[in-house]
Amino acid sequence: MGNGTSRVVGCFVPSNDKNGVDLEFLEPLDEGLGHSFCYVRPSIFESPDITPSNSERFTIDSSTIDSETLTGSFRNDIVDDPSFLNRHNSKGLAETTFKAISGASVSANVSTARTGNQMALCSSDVLEPAASFESTSSFASIPLQPLPRGGSGPLNGFMSGPLERGFASGPLDRNNGFMSGPIEKGVMSGPLDVSDRSNFSAPLSFRRKKPRFQRFMRSVSGPMKSTLARTFSRRSGGLSWMHRFFLHPETRVSWAVGKDGKLHGEDPESCLESNRNLQWAHGKAGEDRVHVVLSEEQGWLFIGIYDGFSGPDAPDFVMSHLYKAIDKELEGLLWDYEEPSEDNQLQPDQEPPTEENMCDPESISEQHSKSVVAESEEVMIDDISSLGNTDTQIADGPPGDSAGPGKKSMRLYELLQLEQWEGEEIGLKRYGGNVALNNMTNQVENPSTSGGGAGNDPCTTDRSALDGIPNSGQRHGTKKSQISSKIRRMYQKQKSLRKKLFPWSYDWHREEGICVEEKIVESSGPIRRRWSGTVDHDAVLRAMARALESTEEAYMDMVEKSLDINPELALMGSCVLVMLMKDQDVYVMNVGDSRAILAQERLHDRHSNPGFGNDEGIGHKSRSRESLVRIELDRISEESPIHNQATPISVSNKNRDVTSYRLKMRAVQLSSDHSTSVEEEIWRIRSEHPEDDQSILKDRVKGQLKVTRAFGAGFLKKPNFNEALLEMFQVEYIGTDPYITCEPCTVHHRLTSSDRFMVLSSDGLYEYFSNEEVVAHVTWFIENVPEGDPAQYLIAELLSRAATKNGMEFHDLLDIPQGDRRKYHDDVSVMVVSLEGRIWRSSGQYYPERKQKFNR
């Protein structure tokens, strides 16, 4: 219905089973367990605001394309409008290799505030959830919710059915209240849409709330909503605007400054172009952090999984800095930046007035001399009004979020100030038009007097003229000013809460002035373009390693400065797993024991699709696009085990199929494990510390860490960091050489036709799965539930295995509070990147025997 829901509905499994669980959310979803989210890549030629046709999600052999009508193909590069195709091809847009991203995280550790975030430590008004998620609107997410006891889903213990997830996640609006995405040159990192609804998957609330608090909130919010609605009904256009403000306080109203100096609603097309450049997602589960950034136009994908230990500071720091460091290092290797063309820049007479030229006498004389020549008093008054509007914007403060040159996002209290100024504007037109006109005319006729002293300052003259104008609504404006100050305080409190929930978005950048300058430069800065030369893959890997090195140096400097106040920072560290995909090139960098697994189809098992090239395929040429979609949907419905009651999914069938997939698929580990489980790592540490016979103690580095390489963990890298700790946390540090390093392993891989998907995860997944089991289970799940969420399925399987291993039921494990549950499983974050999209016709494309099996 225009909100992009159909784009992600394929991530969710429709449940038509009579035994399915009906979702009746009588209480808010609990976000403390974890999140499941997905991103389905749309066609780069479609508008993000237009619902994509289902036909663009299939792939049919190119022989079925009708070259005259451009129909009969489900490839993404075929569209119905040839002019639209040519128009977008002129921009040189790239076709990315990845098609869909599935992610899920589950927390086992309790949530702890970052040590450097003293405001969060002192705040006790909101309980920080152990898991949270935020993203642009292209991602759909929902908190993990276990099925009620006694309920049984088709595959796992979560209420994951895509229908349910689509319902629970709400409208997939194109906005977000947080501009916390990674900063990028020429591209705004946060959503820039004009819609005013929150993009969270579920409210940040919890199951167990005190009834008295709910009654208090209802008693307070009701009168305030009604009062503010009556006050601003003229501007807001009705109660619904205020209703959305209270339900979604993070949202902002976007405005743009036109050439006339007045505020106008932001152009949806301009927002569309800016928002399509970058999509991002941030997630946390316990001490795990997940960072996803992708660009549809440039054809690249960045995924970072940061598995922290001993505290959240290290993974939060990596979340805030590593992507930006990599982006900087890769300039000139994978992409480059070009300055905006002079044709797109404003002419000198079209430049918006600034704080300097507004007070420049010659500038004002030049502006208003045109109005005198036109001999129009109305034009003169409107010009003065537009000048006042611009002045008011600058006086209000720097723009909150720049969407481009001259654009700003306005919060509610800023709208109140704007309305108060409009009241003064009305008084200007009624009473002070002649006074202001005479003053400005005198300045034009006598330019020599405009530069004399402060008494003749044109800006002072304008302001004094405005102040002397009687305003019939002065008392009304005073009331609105009081309400504006109250709402400003409300906004500041909400911002402090968001700082606690998402510390990586705020706490490392405290100087607002610097951030504002960065945003202004960002909006008018250079534009990223594709690197046209030959890519040096070794240079790319070295650049990624340099980015990690510089990020750790900055973190260690920060820790060293804080040792006297927060010595526990020396204990905190993180494993780092980064995957950068650019077209068909995949670059992987890791330190620690998080893994990146590539699933490849064994060549001797590959089969061509039996539907390709036969009579049925030839018949497709003469059929319309819509009929082809219906044929494919009917075929999927018949072959899917979810809809085919004759082939129910049973445990025995699943185990047999998973075993067969282990023979047909191969797991290739692109990352390297850095832990004491690897003999080479143990030998390396002992050879570097021959004088210390206890460098490896109890299968851990100095008896403390299982990992042999990590980001942070300064107490095992510098003796002074170790000495700053309490004695109970110190180790016997011999010498000055570090026991662990942050030297990463880097790998480049060129994707081939046999590569199917990638699985990136923290080490918690491999406590219960081997690499081959992960690939086999994901392949089985995609084969049987092509619209499902494989990452969430892996999380459910892991929790089920953890419960079985410890002799308890699935729900009994989840009933164990976080912190205590860490005894049974670790924080786990999983990302599954499909390299060919959702496998709608996988039964025919991969294993033809599956089709005959379903038809029995």
Curated annotation (Swiss-Prot):
The gene is POL. This is Protein phosphatase 2C 32. Belongs to the PP2C family. The lineage of its organism: Eukaryota, Viridiplantae, Streptophyta, Embryophyta, Tracheophyta. Residues 340-373, 388-407, 446-485 are annotated as: Disordered. Its cofactor is Mg(2+); Mn(2+). Residues 471-485 have a biased composition (Polar residues). It is an enzyme of class 3 (hydrolase). Its EC number is 3.1.3.16. Insensitive to okadaic acid. It catalyses: O-phospho-L-seryl-[protein] + H2O = L-seryl-[protein] + phosphate; O-phospho-L-threonyl-[protein] + H2O = L-threonyl-[protein] + phosphate. Residues 269-835 form the PPM-type phosphatase domain.
